[in-house]
Amino acid sequence: MIEVKDINKSFGSNHVLKGISGKFEAGVTNLIIGGSGSGKTTLLKCMIGLHRPEEGTVEYDDREFTKMNFEEKIEIRKEIGMLFQGSALFDSMTVEENIMFPLNMFTEQSTAEKRERVNFCLDRVNLESKNELFPAELSGGMKKRVGIARAIAMNPKYLFVDEPNSGLDPKTSIVIDELIKEITEEYNTTTIVVTHDMNSVMGIGDYILFLHEGKKFWEGSNKEIAHTDIQELNDFVFASRFMKAAKGKF
């Protein structure tokens, strides 16, 4: 479980996060949603240590991350897998080398052991035998799956995913969403997904934290989200044509 308590973060005079609190449980798909500028990506960066909040705490299974020293944070980061918005693959490396990168950094495994782990991860995301391809040879969906394979290479307790469906067609987006949910449940990871995609929200949102203008406006499940009387949330949820058409069916 990851818990954030009263997180405040500013950049100069811009108060981006205003007292955000929330609990993200293991084994379920946790989503942070909101419009552009709502603070969701800043919150994620505070949670993984890329930003330091002025106030508040981030706790990993009751371990207070925000007060740890550098060496202690390194140990936590070994337990974190991260899928970046653009997949962030190294163009000059093969698929195998990309997935092996965290293993090279954080383990003392033999080359054979690392290659075995790479093959396992590729098989898990249905990309077996793609080891020697380069990112330029992959489709957008395949790049995302390689990114997921790299994110789970260290068998992480915590998985962070930033806008996984950005740039993908609807069919591929569903595949990626289902893969994230399967991995979360299979390995009992604490998974946190930042997204503005309502298809993802309705498909895999076990727990949802809605941010608006840097504040937490609502939290709940995808079964509850269409039945609130919070105007800001309704404006966000029903902004898409799909959700407007589906509104009467909930």
Please provide the spans of the model-predicted regions.
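A short, proline-enriched helix->beta-strand linker immediately N-terminal to the Walker B motif
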Residues: 153-157
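Conserved ABC transporter NBD signature motif
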Residues: 56-64
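Conserved ABC ATPase signature
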Residues: 134-138, 142
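Helix N-cap at the start of a conserved alpha-helix in ABC-type nucleotide-binding domains
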Residues: 170-172
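Short coil-to-helix segment of the ABC ATPase nucleotide-binding domain corresponding to the Q-loop/switch region
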Residues: 93-101
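Helix-to-loop junction immediately C-terminal to a conserved catalytic motif
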Residues: 48
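Catalytic Walker B motif of ABC-type/P-loop ATPase nucleotide-binding domains
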Residues: 159-162
